[in-house]
A protein has these predicted regions:
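Short, charged low-complexity linear segments at domain edges
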Residues: 81-101, 111-126
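Solvent-exposed, well-ordered amphipathic alpha-helical segments
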Residues: 4-6, 29-38, 77, 101-108, ...
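FMN-binding flavodoxin-like domain, especially the glycine-rich phosphate-binding loop
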Residues: 1-98, 157-180
Length: 180
């Protein structure tokens, strides 16, 4: 799709760890598609893989901060300020590590297809929703959230590894990040 020089606000939600180069990459992609990025945000949410990290986020304080940011964006628009904010990140971008794994599916799967319908990259075939193409999976964990039978989850060794890693780097309350 093409932006036609439309103004845009970019968001990269992160799970109380770090958003790394996500906003920089997103802003570059938006600009390449013809959008004029005028603001960016990296709000905190519950981590998609280890839900105890960032649990309860966004909360009331986050909602107030997001509302204030929206007001600042509106004020920027009303002033006619189309400047693009500087966001953290590195060029060249980090190389993506090919991690061909995906959530596991238990016998509880009733093949309702909700996970396939909700998968943003089509890694779960509609005709075989009890399978996942690990090479296409982006590990967003949407399928685990929408499964009515809780039949999809991370494999236990992966959960243990991530819990150990994230416990070291994601403790405490991290701040939302806003860029105007």
């Amino acid at each position: 799709f093409q932006g036609g020089n439309a103004r845009a606000v970019t968001l990269a939600v992160f799970g109380n760890r770090d958003f790394d180069d996500a906003l920089l990459e997103l802003n570059d992609a938006a600009a390449a598609a013809g959008f004029k990025v005028i603001a960016s945000a990296a709000p905190i949410a519950e981590h998609s893989m280890v839900r105890s990290v960032g649990a309860g986020r966004p909360d009331a304080q986050d909602q107030k901060e997001l509302a204030a940011f929206a007001g600042q964006v509106l004020a920027k628009l009303e002033k006619g300020d189309d400047s693009t904010p500087e966001v953290p990140g590195n060029r060249p971008y980090k190389e993506s590590e090919n991690k061909p794994w995906a959530p596991v599916v238990s016998e509880a799967c009733i093949k309702c297809g909700r996970c396939a319908a909700e998968c943003p990259v089509g890694a779960i075939p509609a005709d075989a929703p009890n399978t996942t193409d690990a090479n296409r999976c982006i590990h967003c964990m949407r399928c685990t959230v929408v499964c009515p039978e809780n039949a999809r989850s991370l494999a236990a060794p992966m959960t243990q590894m991530l819990t150990g890693f994230l416990g070291k780097v994601a403790g405490g309350r991290h701040d939302n990040c806003f860029f105007l």
